[in-house]
Amino acid sequence: MTTTLWPQVLKQLEAVLNDQQFLTWIRPLEAVEEDNTLRLIAPSGFILDWVNKKLLSQIKQAVYLVAPVNTPEVTLEVGEYAIESFNEPENTSVPQPLRETKAEREAAEKAASSTSKKKSDSPPKKTIKHNLNTNFTFDTFVEGKANQLAAAAARQVADNPGGSYNPFFIYGGVGLGKTHLMHAIGNELMRRDPNARVVYLHSERFVADMVNALRHNKIDEFKRFYRSLDALLIDDIQFFAKKEQSQEEFFHTFNTLLEGNKQVILTSDRFPKEVDGLEDRLKSRFGWGLTIAVEPPEFEMRVAILMKKAAEFGFLLPDEVAFFIAKRLRGNVRDLEGALKRVGAFAQFTQQLVTVDLAKDALKDLLALQQKMVTLENIQKTVADYYKIRVADLLSKRRTRNIARPRQMSMAISKELTSHSLPEIGDAFGGRDHTTVLHAVRKINELKETDHRIEEDFNSLIRIITN
């Protein structure tokens, strides 16, 4: 068995798992290859249990794909307790040179003694696991109207860490680029200073680290490590909800880092004040810096994403195929990437050129499901639930603001997500004229430019309906 097995397995797993799963549960594993066995060593029992229950079958499948002949057995075990990153070395003295004069030796001993005395006050820097995905950079990030403000702010944070945009909080739905931007900042910080103490982790990993530190009486090391970072990047902060002890520890870590002008970057699937189960004092502090949203990609951005990803995957994507996919799939970047991979694989397996007809064949079940989900009736029900009114109100003749605006929103979304004509949409909304639908579409488009709340409602509803 070669020593290249585990890196190849990692590539297989990175392709099939989402970023959160891969970075939180797979990256921390260490691999030892011996006697036709792949020993995977987890840094904690918590991670071992999760991998064993949730991901072991996928790991074994990836191992088989890499080594179908003499496939090694996969075993899991917990390593000696220590999250490598926050263990201090037992001996930090500088190794002595092979040849030295008496004067040089005395000087070295004096320096070592001085270093030893200062150890408790200023622990030495050491290499730590940053957990960054080096593929997620600003260069590989596709910008559009939906994320250009977030991208510009992220670059500012990378240029001036610990500055006015601290903390930097990015929120939005799944697969819209929050994690990519977070890693891009981290990678840029590491590029500029390879010795920077930058760490990315999922909020669940922070909780797991703290639990293990408490269990093994290592809480002081845990605190010292996280509070000594130059930049702390925590994904999906909403998972801190209702975990009081974790919130307490993070609160103090957060304060220490900000007081030291160290950068904190956070993400969530919603606006921080809307995260239920999160302490008010944390929500308040998250607002000290810059909070910014990423929205679902607009049509032009979806096309750009498809073109760029196709180039990365190594196949030519004709414009008309990119337009076809972008028009019919309005979800997140991950959905687009998945659809593109399917089209590319279908073309390779059938040895055909990538055309619109081929894309229709490759995506027919996905498109059928999307069409089944996105109906006028479904749009009406979703909008009514969102605004806490009845579908009957949308179809009625009532013209009060609390009914008229959701009705206009429903019509605009119907025009955006379905192929129904204006008269058909009007007929579905209580027999209204097509000019009423046209007015509603124009009104919502105008309001999206001037009213942030309307724009947020529109994007949230699109996300709910298409996902």
UniProtKB/Swiss-Prot annotation:
UniProt protein name: Chromosomal replication initiator protein DnaA
SUPFAM superfamilies in alphabetical order: P-loop containing nucleoside triphosphate hydrolases (SSF52540), TrpR-like (SSF48295)
Gene, per the UniProt record: dnaA
Domain IV, binds dsDNA: annotated segments: 348-467
Gene3D superfamilies the record matches: 1.10.1750.10, 1.10.8.60, 3.30.300.180, P-loop containing nucleotide triphosphate hydrolases
Residue ranges, annotated region (Domain III, AAA+ region): 131-347
Entry keyword annotation includes Oxidoreductase: no
Residues the entry annotates as binding ATP: 175, 177-179
Annotated region described as Disordered, given as residue ranges: 87-129
Segments of this protein annotated with the region Domain I, interacts with DnaA modulators: 1-85
Keywords on record: ATP-binding, Cytoplasm, DNA replication, DNA-binding, Lipid-binding, Nucleotide-binding
Keyword DNA-binding attributed: yes
Superkingdom of the source species: Bacteria
GO cellular component: cytoplasm; plasma membrane
Protein's cellular compartments: Cytoplasm
